[in-house]
Amino acid sequence: MTDTVQTLIPTLDVSERVARPKVEAGVKLRGAEKVARIPVKIIPTVDLPKKPDWIRVRIPVSPEVDRIKQLLRKHKLHSVCEEASCPNLGECFSGGTATFMIMGDICTRRCPFCDVGHGRPKPLDVNEPKSLAIAIADLRLKYVVITSVDRDDLRDGGAQHFADCIREIRLLSPGVQLETLVPDYRGRMDVALEITAAEPPDVFNHNLETVPRLYKAARPGSDYQWSLTLLQRFKQMVPHVPTKSGLMLGLGETDEEVIEVMQRMREHDIDMLTLGQYLQPSRNHLPVQRFVHPDTFAWFAEEGYKMGFKNVASGPLVRSSYHADEQAKIAKAML
């Protein structure tokens, strides 16, 4: 089912390279500045490819969208919906839900598929767990996804801050279901998992993002096997909590590679899967190599269920937290 795809990403000519900026604490680098020092350089896309009809989304403008944005500003919170330019922002915000991003909006990684800014983060806001809990109570949410930037500057990678947020939220909203979408805790897996197991979420999510062949280009600083091991070890420590992971398609992978990664996920006890289309945030990000047809996404879902995934969300506009409440309900019923 796979066409031949271009997988090599050319290196910028020395004369064309962006000058490497000095990164100061609290300064957010995006676009060309962000990816200036990654191993595989990005040539800015001159003409962005036209999106097929099945990718078109409604412009996220509505009173409910504005209300939630105002509430986030009031409590000095960040939503990954905005920071990562999610195509489902309008639908999710209009439905009165949001995925909250904790530990600031500056990431210590430089992944060139991602629209979140890079830099040296400021110290953690010790009031954030309480502010997040108050915002969730104000919104009267029943299902909440909490994610974060990577914080390689922290000894535990931010695991304790996740746990503090979970504790505060459950104090103010005892009935809420919580899903965490965590970083890879590079070099800190043991301590991070000990903390997480002591205050576990209702769903534990960590995205592999792409196939291992593309990690150097798409996830510099991350390791494919490390991420698989993180998910499996959590499952071994807290077996009653569903584990979840996801991939973006369109970065240059083949269908066969996607199937192989899905099989590896099942070998590492991952219960839930999300597959969605990669959309290039700007001309300075990794280019889209292909737009995967909805029929192919449907085929991946069929194959996933055959492998034993409890739930598979697979479609062009699917993102990790898209309809996460429905995904979790189905997966938990099957555990």
Swiss-Prot record:
Which PROSITE patterns does this chain map to?
A: RADICAL_SAM (PS51918)
Requisite cofactors:
[4Fe-4S] cluster
What CDD domains does the record point to? Answer: Radical_SAM (cd01335)
Q: Which UniProt keywords apply?
A: 4Fe-4S, Cytoplasm, Iron, Iron-sulfur, Metal-binding, S-adenosyl-L-methionine, Transferase
Give the matching Gene3D superfamilies.
Aldolase class I
Protein's UniProt name: Lipoyl synthase
Q: Which InterPro entries match?
A: Aldolase_TIM, Elp3/MiaA/NifB-like_rSAM, LIAS_N, Lipoyl_synth, rSAM
Identify the PANTHER family for this entry: LIPOYL SYNTHASE, LIPOYL SYNTHASE, MITOCHONDRIAL
The text of the family note is: Belongs to the radical SAM superfamily. Lipoyl synthase family.
Q: Which Pfam families match?
A: LIAS_N (PF16881), Radical_SAM (PF04055)
A GO CC annotation recorded here is:
cytoplasm
Where it sits in the cell: the answer is: Cytoplasm
Q: Which organism is it from?
A: Pseudomonas savastanoi pv. phaseolicola (strain 1448A / Race 6)
Q: Specify which residues bind [4Fe-4S] cluster 2 according to the UniProt entry for this protein.
A: C107, C111, C114
Known pathway = Protein modification; protein lipoylation via endogenous pathway; protein N(6)-(lipoyl)lysine from octanoyl-[acyl-carrier-protein]: step 2/2
For this protein's source organism, the top of the classification is: Bacteria, Pseudomonadati, Pseudomonadota, Gammaproteobacteria, Pseudomonadales
Record-listed E.C. numbers = 2.8.1.8
Molecular function terms in GO for this entry?
Answer: 4 iron, 4 sulfur cluster binding; lipoate synthase activity; metal ion binding
Q: How is the cofactor bound?
A: Binds 2 [4Fe-4S] clusters per subunit. One cluster is coordinated with 3 cysteines and an exchangeable S-adenosyl-L-methionine.
Query: Which reactions is this enzyme annotated as catalysing?
Result: [[Fe-S] cluster scaffold protein carrying a second [4Fe-4S](2+) cluster] + N(6)-octanoyl-L-lysyl-[protein] + 2 oxidized [2Fe-2S]-[ferredoxin] + 2 S-adenosyl-L-methionine + 4 H(+) = [[Fe-S] cluster scaffold protein] + N(6)-[(R)-dihydrolipoyl]-L-lysyl-[protein] + 4 Fe(3+) + 2 hydrogen sulfide + 2 5'-deoxyadenosine + 2 L-methionine + 2 reduced [2Fe-2S]-[ferredoxin]
Which positions are annotated as binding [4Fe-4S] cluster 1?
A: C81, C86, C92, S321
User: What positions does the domain Radical SAM core occupy?
Assistant: 93-310
